[in-house]
């Protein structure tokens, strides 16, 4: 069994960093449609996410902005990956993570693959479901904090988001260790 792990929300200034771990139950027929979540349209991501969730074992983990501020985004991303894998509770022959760094995971083999979210099906799948999950969370936060445009900016430091911070102030879910304005 191969497990792919990726995270989303590293560059955001609002909310958690979120990771997903994915193991396909069998080889699905839609693998050729997978790609890095950033390269797919919202509609395509949501469609593929539903297929992935039906055809894979998966787990999510998020690390709050407070913890990000305490341990930094790099360590928080690795921790999210570690927890997502642990939540799967399935032993894998090979764990593949997107990026340069390996989280603290007990596995027979583990490898970090730069641009893995564009090359490895399991990492692509993790990228997609993590992005869809975090985007849904931002839509929910937008209902609570409509002045910050979270539905549109997804917590990233857009001009509109930074202008909203200048005008309305920093929220408890903003990452204080990041340059907010």
From Swiss-Prot:
<dbReference type="GO" id="GO:0004523">
    <property type="term" value="F:RNA-DNA hybrid ribonuclease activity"/>
</dbReference>
<dbReference type="InterPro" id="IPR001352">
    <property type="entry name" value="RNase_HII/HIII"/>
</dbReference>
<protein>
    <recommendedName>
        <fullName>Ribonuclease HII</fullName>
        <ecNumber>3.1.26.4</ecNumber>
    </recommendedName>
</protein>
<feature type="binding site">
    <location>
        <position position="98"/>
    </location>
    <ligand>
        <name>a divalent metal cation</name>
    </ligand>
</feature>
<dbReference type="GO" id="GO:0043137">
    <property type="term" value="P:DNA replication, removal of RNA primer"/>
</dbReference>
<dbReference type="InterPro" id="IPR022898">
    <property type="entry name" value="RNase_HII"/>
</dbReference>
<comment type="function">
    <text>Endonuclease that specifically degrades the RNA of RNA-DNA hybrids.</text>
</comment>
<dbReference type="GO" id="GO:0005737">
    <property type="term" value="C:cytoplasm"/>
</dbReference>
<dbReference type="InterPro" id="IPR012337">
    <property type="entry name" value="RNaseH-like_sf"/>
</dbReference>
<keyword id="KW-0378">Hydrolase</keyword>
<feature type="binding site">
    <location>
        <position position="7"/>
    </location>
    <ligand>
        <name>a divalent metal cation</name>
    </ligand>
</feature>
<dbReference type="InterPro" id="IPR036397">
    <property type="entry name" value="RNaseH_sf"/>
</dbReference>
<keyword id="KW-0479">Metal-binding</keyword>
<dbReference type="InterPro" id="IPR024567">
    <property type="entry name" value="RNase_HII/HIII_dom"/>
</dbReference>
<dbReference type="GO" id="GO:0032299">
    <property type="term" value="C:ribonuclease H2 complex"/>
</dbReference>
<dbReference type="GO" id="GO:0006298">
    <property type="term" value="P:mismatch repair"/>
</dbReference>
<comment type="similarity">
    <text>Belongs to the RNase HII family.</text>
</comment>
<keyword id="KW-0255">Endonuclease</keyword>
<keyword id="KW-0540">Nuclease</keyword>
<dbReference type="Pfam" id="PF01351">
    <property type="entry name" value="RNase_HII"/>
</dbReference>
<keyword id="KW-0464">Manganese</keyword>
<dbReference type="GO" id="GO:0003723">
    <property type="term" value="F:RNA binding"/>
</dbReference>
<dbReference type="GO" id="GO:0030145">
    <property type="term" value="F:manganese ion binding"/>
</dbReference>
<feature type="domain" description="RNase H type-2">
    <location>
        <begin position="1"/>
        <end position="181"/>
    </location>
</feature>
<feature type="binding site">
    <location>
        <position position="6"/>
    </location>
    <ligand>
        <name>a divalent metal cation</name>
    </ligand>
</feature>
<keyword id="KW-0963">Cytoplasm</keyword>
């Amino acid at each position: 069994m191969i497990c792919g792990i990726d995270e989303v929300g590293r560059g955001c200034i609002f909310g958690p960093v979120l990771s997903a771990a994915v193991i396909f139950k069998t080889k699905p027929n839609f693998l050729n449609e997978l790609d890095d979540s950033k390269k797919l349209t919202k509609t395509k991501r949501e469609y593929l996410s539903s297929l992935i969730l039906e055809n894979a074992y998966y787990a999510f983990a998020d690390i709050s902005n407070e913890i990000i501020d305490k341990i930094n985004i790099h360590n928080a991303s690795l921790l999210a990956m570690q927890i997502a894998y642990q939540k799967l509770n399935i032993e894998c022959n090979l764990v593949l993570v997107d990026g340069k760094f390996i989280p603290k995971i007990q596995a027979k083999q583990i490898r970090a693959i730069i641009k893995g979210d564009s090359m490895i099906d399991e990492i692509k799948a993790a990228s997609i479901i993590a992005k869809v999950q975090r985007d849904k969370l931002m839509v929910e936060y937008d209902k609570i904090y409509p002045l910050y445009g979270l539905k549109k900016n997804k917590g990233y430091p857009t001009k509109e988001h930074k202008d909203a911070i200048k005008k309305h102030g920093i929220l408890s879910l903003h990452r204080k260790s990041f340059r907010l304005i």
